């Protein structure tokens, strides 16, 4: 067999060596071979002695959800009022204390929903609305928020050179003047208005396209806005510094945040907020580095909804903190229900690979991953019994139970799965901790079955396959069943098993000897079937604890097949409240499995009667 394999390998090698497959030449049908002729790299700020790389995130930021405004405006089919209400209450229940609910000056629907939020928000939740820097729109927005316990007016103005020059044809001085004018009007209509004193008014200004704005101009325009608003330490002004379009790597954004944080005056009266989009796929990284660089507040959406490629995913940012031992002050204990609301209201599915929330993020299909996870759980269970609480499981940075998931879905089994995957499912579904050799054998059967179906196997399918493959507890095939038995001890090592078994309709007496109950029963069945069985492996363990404890026994028997006299092996499993009974069940499960396979024949009626007669004669 080895020689044939070597010859086959040599033939394969010779076959490939004789063929020439030329390299693939890139066509560049649409992309440019040299993109530098069309695109230029971002001109990053020069920041010396940056401090943020040495910082750590040690506390939660202020969070603002803009799902109902930025997220909703980007949907192909925006939310209905009822969906907005459901979403709003889910955000409140998660723990968001700042929620941007609308653009109330844009439509009556947005205005009406703002009024709903004002009337139904808990006292500690601030309702935020976005508005352009125009007088009539600002007045309408203030009207929508009147009566709120806590409210934030959010104005914005594009400050990047490209937007000022191409879109608005506006100088820097004109931009500053417009931002200050809007700020003064908001102040006049809110915190300076005697009739509005029941509301705690806050103000947010966004230099839109901040990440593409020269740093010194971003500071200059915000200084002017701050002077117009006159914030306090108790109620600081919010400067939202958005990566409206992500144009550079996250470290550049962090440099921009640190530059702003170290150059803006009266820092104690300023709340720096991030608002990262995901155009380059780095929204989460930019947000986290922004916090390292001094940001106090984070804006975004659940699961990253938003314009184009979306806003930063607040679930990911929050849970990244959580898995580093820092409480995000947001409760995602039932993340599946959050996912359901987001998908139903947004009418956009969340990727199965989305961090933390995706259906597959706590699942392992790879055999090596499954084996590592199984070993991790086994060790962790032992450590927890000793009082250790730290979570240390390979491939699982988060305990699935913390977000409302169970362990059943952690390991999924397909044709690529190894012994650990199938063994994990059996451990979770039947409580059986399979011996290593049995794991290897069963995983092969599982892989073959998954291959034949061309899909993943469900837990109940794997359990059914196991019960059939190993005649679990002698429940599948019962060609021979035990009626009664007794084991007597002779001397220090010899045991004699006597009993009766039912073969078909006949009751047959059996007898065997060995150095223990297991070997003597195996000898008795060997005598009955005229086949020499031997115990190749035997293990047992307890199931459960306390009064409900059961024992599981695993028997691996060797024998020679009737057809060709070749040596073969079979496993069997028995479970009972009594360890002796569980081992007996395991032996009969194995013997009946061997008979069912056709490797060994059941005695004929004449043979059974002959054995009974012989037993009676010897008696």
Curated annotation (Swiss-Prot):
Pfam families: HMGL-like, IPMS_D2, LeuA_dimer. It comes from the Eukaryota. A divalent metal cation binds at residues 70, 275, 277, 311. Signal peptide: none annotated. Disruption phenotype: Retains 20% 2-isopropylmalate synthase activity and grows in the absence of Leu; a double LEU1-LEU9 deletion has no 2-isopropylmalate synthase, does not grow in the absence of Leu. Its cofactor is a divalent metal cation. It catalyses: 3-methyl-2-oxobutanoate + acetyl-CoA + H2O = (2S)-2-isopropylmalate + CoA + H(+). The keyword Metal-binding applies. Pathway: Amino-acid biosynthesis; L-leucine biosynthesis; L-leucine from 3-methyl-2-oxobutanoate: step 1/4. Coiled coil: none annotated. The keyword Transferase applies. PROSITE patterns: AIPM_HOMOCIT_SYNTH_1, AIPM_HOMOCIT_SYNTH_2, PYR_CT. One of its GO terms (biological process) is L-leucine biosynthetic process. GO terms for molecular function: 2-isopropylmalate synthase activity; metal ion binding. GO terms for cellular component: cytoplasm; mitochondrion. Its EC number is 2.3.3.13. Residues 61-336 form the Pyruvate carboxyltransferase domain. SMART domains: LeuA_dimer. Transmembrane segments: none annotated. Keywords: Amino-acid biosynthesis, Branched-chain amino acid biosynthesis, Cytoplasm, Leucine biosynthesis, Metal-binding, Mitochondrion, Transferase. Belongs to the alpha-IPM synthase/homocitrate synthase family. LeuA type 2 subfamily. Present with 6630 molecules/cell in log phase SD medium. Catalyzes the condensation of the acetyl group of acetyl-CoA with 3-methyl-2-oxobutanoate (2-oxoisovalerate) to form 3-carboxy-3-hydroxy-4-methylpentanoate (2-isopropylmalate). Homodimer. This is 2-isopropylmalate synthase. It comes from Saccharomyces cerevisiae (strain ATCC 204508 / S288c).
